[in-house]
A protein has these predicted regions:
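Beta-rich interaction/scaffold domains
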Residues: 1-79
Length: 79
């Protein structure tokens, strides 16, 4: 089943939410009161989501720079 342009845009927006969450956790601006285990789990889940999504074959002109940066930062993160 092919995705519509709207569905692809929604996927890209969701990826942006994961990028923001990963970045904010690493910067200490999100989940500050959570345990290291919870922060690590959240980063790991969001990195996995981004890795799965960036591998999709329906992307065209979307800029994945921030996504790739968040994947790298998340993979290097230890809470």
């Amino acid at each position: 089943m092919d995705k519509t342009t709207e569905e692809i845009a929604q996927d890209f927006t969701a990826m942006g939410h994961s990028v923001t969450l990963i970045t904010d956790i690493i910067a200490g601006n999100a989940m500050a009161d959570d345990t290291a285990e919870d922060k690590q789990g959240c980063v790991d889940r969001n990195v996995e989501h981004l890795e799965l999504m960036v591998a999709k074959d329906y992307w065209t002109t979307e800029d994945m720079t921030d996504v790739e940066s968040a994947i790298t930062a998340g993979n290097n993160y230890t809470a």
